[in-house]
């Protein structure tokens, strides 16, 4: 029987309040925070905070927890100052054959929880990812997945469904919405029983009225402690290759950064590398598109990776309202791809290179145009080559 509670029951009822300095994720998480954790998670949390550069200032026992719902799981600890790449991988043969797909991909969990019988998770944190002056509203939201039977587990590159509370205009429950997962399989706190999302509130005009998206607004407004119906996980299109020597090109706009964040944390966060035993040795190149600098998501973390892993990670930004392309127009991600098309193509010629694209569907035509020109310069036809890459499981696209 499925037990959908927000927090796992602890063995002896003891709870501890842990006060930590410099706790959180990226530039939005600073200062001192207090976390309420069960005894069984205390040692794991302490190790994670130490590995990621946080500082525990106090640990205080509190009254016994009367029920699972009273225990608020630990929030994400700020990533430690860990290593960030620039050198292009050596080109090998043409991109006709895929790098071997690990057998572990056959074990990827899918649809552990379905809409008719969803898992009920608990919100542990919800905070803005945007700096002052940003456009719109984007939040980082974390859910506790403890207590499920089966355990709701997932891997990098998958999505989960959220069923918002309430009913539609016809009196029926709202339909689920899928969101790309923004945390690794270990969660932001490395405990292994949380999942995080990166959610932009959808807003559009209709008949002179501003309409807010049902599920995105539900999530951006939700408070810690609230219960949320979750389905999934789903998806095998965006899975990260298991090959430690693979090369990864990432093209993202807006909240399409979510799966890319999971890849990069798995590659470069010290606590991740220690826990999963997966030591990335290849090259990774992230192209990120945003309207303003204030809208760059997880930017501080990516800058840190680039500075600390210069041989393995490269970070290229396209900020449309602040930068100009070579024609004097706004700088979009497709313009950055066009600028670097020859180098990107040299990466793609290496059969170990995978390309991931996630974000607005409007980015695809421009990227295709840039790749078409680069391929033509080499006497190749991009419209024929792209399906070959897709068939070889090296071209991964998730746009909306």
Regions found by a protein language model. Name each.
Residues 2, 6-13, 21-29, 86, ...:
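Reductase modules of NAD(P)H-dependent flavoproteins
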Residues 252-259:
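Ser/Thr-glycine-rich phosphate-binding loops at phosphate-binding pockets of nucleotides
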